[in-house]
Amino acid sequence: MARTLFASLFLFLVLGLVAGQGDDTDGPDAESLASLDRTATRRYGDGEDLLHLLGQTGQHRTAMTKPNVILLLADDMGVGDLSVYGHPTQEPGFIDQMANQGLRFTQGYSGDSVCTPSRSAIVTGRQPIRTGVYGEERIFLPWTTTGLPLYEVTIAEAMKGAGYTTGMVGKWHLGINENSSSDGAHLPANRGFDFVGHNLPFGNSWRCDDTGLHQDFPDTNACFLYYNSTSVAQPFQHKGLTQLLRDDTVGFIEDNVNKPFFMYVSFAHMHTSLFSSDDFSCTSRRGRYGDNLREMDQAIEQIVTTLVDNDIDDNTVIFFTSDHGPHREYCGEGGDANVFRGGKGQSWEGGHRIPYIVYWPGTISPGVSHEIVTSMDIIATAVNLGGSQLPTDRIYDGKCLKSVLLEGASSPHDDFFYYCKDTLMAVRVGKYKAHFKTQTDSSQMKLGERCDGGFPLDDYFLCSDCEGDCVTEHNPPIMFDLEKDPGENYPLGPCGYEHVLLHVKDAIARHDAEMVIGTPVLDNFDFSIIPCCNPETNCVCNYTHEPGVAECYQDLINIALRNGVPK
């Protein structure tokens, strides 16, 4: 009781001094003091805690002038995967809570529908056709000698320029080596990140499955875990991976409490192969996919709890989204696109629509927005909130969302362009979308025929081509009203959209006029640069020293030495 009274008295004295500095300003009334007293006692406990907090005020002042920024990125998560976005059996979790207490967008778009180009769009704020992140291939492979071009300014480099400490964990997929199997020329440590924890330079894929479900042995050419720029496990152990990323993130936050930071947390969930720790296995009524989502959800909750424990939650803006739409070809292991047609790799809405949540307690009012936003907007928004600006010598497709987030303003986007490599597939103008080319989209019945017990047949892949037999060209384009028909099921008749087509053509003309196409960088290969932690063990090793894991890797090493491993 005495300590609480002390807290109240101390607050009264501080507020009295502040009020006395103004000539004509009245002091706080009794109700305001009572409210402040309740807040202080509830949040800080007693006078000693309050004194400690006030003693730290000077240290936190720099951080408070610049909000911390955290980008939480899911892999292959569909817009319909979360309960808050309408999934009927996925259990509500902490991400749903962030959506309900933050701003949830119903029209979030990815910069591309495939991993590498969509991630380049996020970290640069520019469409892949501008940055050159396209080619005959659609992604950076472990034997690609190039990476995200050095002339592109990454979100980490931009935030460093704004006075931020930068960190990254998880999936990178924007290049690895250039001249040798270990030079790490294109890794995140060379692209503006001060701290790089455990990361997947290539990513997780069905080839990394260590359960025997998809193949007998993980492919060492594609499955490696790094810490900073050093390989620590090849192939990596799935169990415990999410916890490693979480712990790295928590440590980074705690190390940078007193200065502004940007943290990029790029989860391996929800990409196939699915995985979860024993604590989450068989806990979701949705099955393995639900288990995976719940594990990622808890990691996010623990990251946010760290912000709360360090009293910086109200000075931290969090973006949660996905790189693109769900990989439907993986049947029961793929995500949910909700009502939207198509999925990963396609220009239908299902390939580009993503969950998009912005959470900033005390600053962003809770709500739902139907404005169009894109993953490319994150860099422009973060840099602006940090009091800086992006370079003016190039075109940015991403726009600053500050007024949308804080004032409920309209979207800065009047249109959106859907590319497949360097091919313009479709254009959205307002509520209308014009398709110039479409990929064959398998019906749900066809999907069911191609899935054996919920798992894909070896030869089953959806059409994600940009041209060829499974791509249909439309001249004139087929048109959809996305407000009335978000599933793109009912094309408008030609007599109903002549005026809209004029607006589409105008948008394309403006787009083409300012387009400088980047030189493609995805087709330069050298198989000698594939990462290999130890050639003497056929590239099978573990240096992470995780409890209970070393024995597992020793078994793998023995197999590799005895029989060799798939290359």
Swiss-Prot record:
Cofactor: Ca(2+)
Gene3D superfamilies documented for this protein: 3.30.1120.10, Alkaline Phosphatase, subunit A
Annotated positions binding Ca(2+): 75-76, 115, 323-324
Compartments where located: Secreted
Ligase recorded as keyword: no
Textual note on the cofactor: Binds 1 Ca(2+) ion per subunit.
Record note on modification: The conversion to 3-oxoalanine (also known as C-formylglycine, FGly), of a serine or cysteine residue in prokaryotes and of a cysteine residue in eukaryotes, is critical for catalytic activity.
Cell cycle recorded as keyword: no
Gene Ontology cellular-component annotations: extracellular region
Record InterPro entries: Alkaline_phosphatase_core_sf, Sulfatase, Sulfatase_CS, Sulfatase_N
Active site: 115 (nucleophile), 173
Free-text tissue specificity from the UniProt record: Expression is confined to aboral ectoderm cells and their precursors.
Keywords for the protein's UniProt record, in alphabetical order: Calcium, Glycoprotein, Hydrolase, Metal-binding, Secreted, Signal
Family label: Belongs to the sulfatase family.
Protein name: Arylsulfatase
Taxonomic source organism: Strongylocentrotus purpuratus (Purple sea urchin)
